[in-house]
Amino acid sequence: MSAPLLEIDGLCVVPPGAAAPVCRDISFALARGSRTALVGPSGAGKTSLLRAINGSLPAQAGSVTVDDCRLDPRRARQLRAFRRKVAVIPQKHDLVEGLRVHQNVMAGALGRWSNWRALRFLFWPLAAELAEARQALEKVELADKLQVRAGALSGGQQQRVAIARALVQQPLLILADEPVASLDPRMAHQVLELLCRLAEEEGVALICTLHQPELAAQYFPRILEMEGGRLVDDRHGDRAKDSPSMRPLQRSEQALSA
């Protein structure tokens, strides 16, 4: 059996100024190329866990290891190498709306570019760099938006640009934080289908936080559930909706859609 891609052991996270941990003794492992949904009510600690995995929220205890590289925020070079392996798709997209789509997409390459190359790209992009941006946009069916300003795109299109940006990073793991939270049901299915298909085609592991248990069960073979900063359930997608702890989430979702 091959070694897991991601290993989390005893992770405890207390944000600055917080009185209590937002993640408590979290431990699990993920295989390379696997797809996992992270579910739970608001405030359960899902986003904080993703931020801790990426190193943007420091942990007070425990460890995070990706591809045999242990996260150590105190070592700048090691942290930079670690973050190259982990791409983040934030809930708010984090696109620069005044820049063109190809510029936002190629921001995914900043971790492997020098500062000079990044600055030069903003004003004088090379043909090869534009070709790489176009290739990533073709994967998310937005190649015709290469030169459009990001602010002119719809919410679903902006989410797909964020996915293309993550692919350009060439990561081993993608962390997607509520990628369909602001989308209507039809667009939510389209984005999840695209995200899961591309992760499988690229051989990239995927962790996706979701509020909708039925979407988690439909698109993800494994579901981790959080409550009160702890992992309370770890089960396969085909049995997830039968879990008693998932039923309050289902009732809440049904009430919102009624």
Model-derived regions, located:
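Helix-to-loop junction immediately C-terminal to a conserved catalytic motif
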Residues: 54
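ABC ATPase NBD Q-loop/coupling interface
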Residues: 63-81, 123
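Conserved ABC ATPase "signature" region
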Residues: 116-144
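Conserved ABC ATPase signature
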Residues: 149-153, 157
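Conserved catalytic motifs of ABC-family nucleotide-binding domains
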Residues: 170
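Catalytic Walker B motif of ABC-type/P-loop ATPase nucleotide-binding domains
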Residues: 174-177
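H-loop/switch region of ABC-family ATPase nucleotide-binding domains
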Residues: 210-211
